Amino acid sequence: MKLLTNANTLKGTIRVPGDKSISHRAIIFGSISQGVTRIVDVLRGEDVLSTIEAFKQMGVLIEDDGEIITIYGKGFAGLTQPNNLLDMGNSGTSMRLIAGVLAGQEFEVTMVGDNSLSKRPMDRIALPLSKMGARISGVTNRDLPPLKLQGTKKLKPIFYHLPVASAQVKSALIFAALQTKGESLIVEKEQTRNHTEDMIRQFGGHLDIKDKEIRLNGGQSLVGQDIRVPGDISSAAFWIVVGLIIPNSHIILENVGINETRTGILDVVSKMGGKIKLSSVDNQVKSATLTVDYSHLQATHISGAMIPRLIDELPIIALLATQAQGTTVIADAQELKVKETDRIQVVVESLKQMGADITATADGMIIRGNTPLHAASLDCHGDHRIGMMIAIAALLVKEGEVDLSGEEAINTSYPNFLEHLEGLVNA
C-alpha cells in the first residue's frame, strides 16, 4: 500500500485500543478463576483473540457482545483437554503464558503458531516448567514451536532465577506456581512489566514482592472480577512520537495506561526535551490523558534497567532518535532479536533504506540525528510494530512515495491504526 507522506501538522484526539498485555492476562485470569469476570475495553487484536480462542477450546464459556467480554470461570480444575491443536497465531504471549497454565493440567496439548512464532525461543519456558514436573517437547530440543506439553497435577514449586528479563517467562511460572502445593520463589534479572502480579491481587490472590524477588504459594482461590483495560502505551507510543517530530503538532491521547513498569518512553521523551503532559490521572486503573506537542529533541542513551520498561517501544524510539540532535545509543536490548522479527536488524535496515544514519550493534543500535528521510519501498516482515514505525516515518518524507507491503500485520495489536493515522493527517 502507498502510505501517507509529507505531513505538515497533526492535530486531534485519539483513544488508543486496550493494552495488549493486560488484555491477555485478564482473559487468562478470568478463565482460571471461579465465577464471572467482565472485561471492558479489551484489545480485540489477533493476538488476544488467539488467547480467547484457546480457552474456549479448553471448555471455558466466553461471551463477547462487542462492548463487554464475559467469562464464566470454573478455576484451573474446570479446564478440559481441547479437541484440536491450540493455534497461537503470532502471539508469543499466548503461547508462553498458557504453557504455564497447562503445566498443571493432566492432559496433553500441542501448541502451534505461525511462521514467525515458530522461530521464537521457547526453551526459556520449557526448562523451568520441566523442572516443575511438566513434560515439554518442541523442535530442536524444546527450543522452537510446535510445543507438545503434558502437564501434571503433581506440579512442584520452583526457586528460579530468570536468565533473561522477560515478563512472559515470569508470568508463565506464576501461573504454574499457582497450581503447586508449596511456595515458589522467582527472581527477576531486571524488573519487567508487573501486570500479572497486579492482577493476582485484583482476583483475590496473594504474593510477596521484594525488589526483584516474587514469592507465592500454590492452591490459592481466585475469584472473578470486573476489569477495565486501559489504553496500550505501546500503541500510544506511535502518536507520542509523531506529535513530537511533525512541526506544530498537538495530539491528545485519552485513557493511556501509565503502569510504572511500562512508562520508560515517557521518561526517555522527557530526557530528550519532549513536551508531554499528563492529566486526568486514574490511580486505580493506572491511566491518564497524555498531551503531546512538537518539540526540538536532543539525543540520549538508553540501556540497563530502562530497557524492559520500553522494550516494545524501541522501534519507534529509534525513529524518534533520527529526528533528534546528536547521537543516540540503545544498548542492552538483545531481547529485540527474538521478537516477531530480529527488531535490531529490521529497524536498522528499514530506516537506513529511508536515509537514516543508523547502525546495528550486538545489543542495540546507534542513531545519528537529525536526518531527513526519503521515499522507499518497505516490508513489515510480519511485525506489527515495524509496520506502524514505517507508517509514521513516511509522514516525514517530503517527495516521492513510500510503499509498504504486509500491512495486515498491524492488526496484531492495533486494527484501527491506519484509520486513526488518516484522521490525524486530515484533521
Swiss-Prot record:
| Residues binding phosphoenolpyruvate, per UniProt | K20, G92, R120, Q168, R343, R385
Residues annotated as catalytic: D312
Record-linked Gene3D superfamilies: Enolpyruvate transferase domain (3.65.10.10)
The record, for PROSITE patterns, names: EPSP_SYNTHASE_1, EPSP_SYNTHASE_2
Residues that bind 3-phosphoshikimate, according to the entry? K20, S21, R25, S166, Q168, D312, K339
Q: Where in the cell is it found?
A: Cytoplasm
**Where does this protein act, in terms of pathway?**
Metabolic intermediate biosynthesis; chorismate biosynthesis; chorismate from D-erythrose 4-phosphate and phosphoenolpyruvate: step 6/7
Q: What is its EC number?
A: 2.5.1.19
The UniProt entry's GO biological process terms, in alphabetical order, are:
amino acid biosynthetic process; aromatic amino acid family biosynthetic process; chorismate biosynthetic process
SUPFAM superfamilies xrefs: EPT/RTPC-like
> What's one Pfam family here?
EPSP_synthase
Which chemical reaction does it catalyze?
3-phosphoshikimate + phosphoenolpyruvate = 5-O-(1-carboxyvinyl)-3-phosphoshikimate + phosphate
| Keywords for the protein's UniProt record, in alphabetical order | Amino-acid biosynthesis, Aromatic amino acid biosynthesis, Cytoplasm, Transferase
Query: What are the annotated GO cellular component locations?
Result: cytoplasm
> Where does the source fall among the domains of life?
Bacteria
According to the UniProt entry, its GO molecular function terms are: 3-phosphoshikimate 1-carboxyvinyltransferase activity
The record describes its quaternary structure and partners as:
Monomer.
* Family (UniProt): Belongs to the EPSP synthase family.
Query: Per its database record, what is this protein's job?
Result: Catalyzes the transfer of the enolpyruvyl moiety of phosphoenolpyruvate (PEP) to the 5-hydroxyl of shikimate-3-phosphate (S3P) to produce enolpyruvyl shikimate-3-phosphate and inorganic phosphate.
What's the protein name? 3-phosphoshikimate 1-carboxyvinyltransferase
Originating organism: Streptococcus agalactiae serotype III (strain NEM316)
Designated gene of the protein: aroA
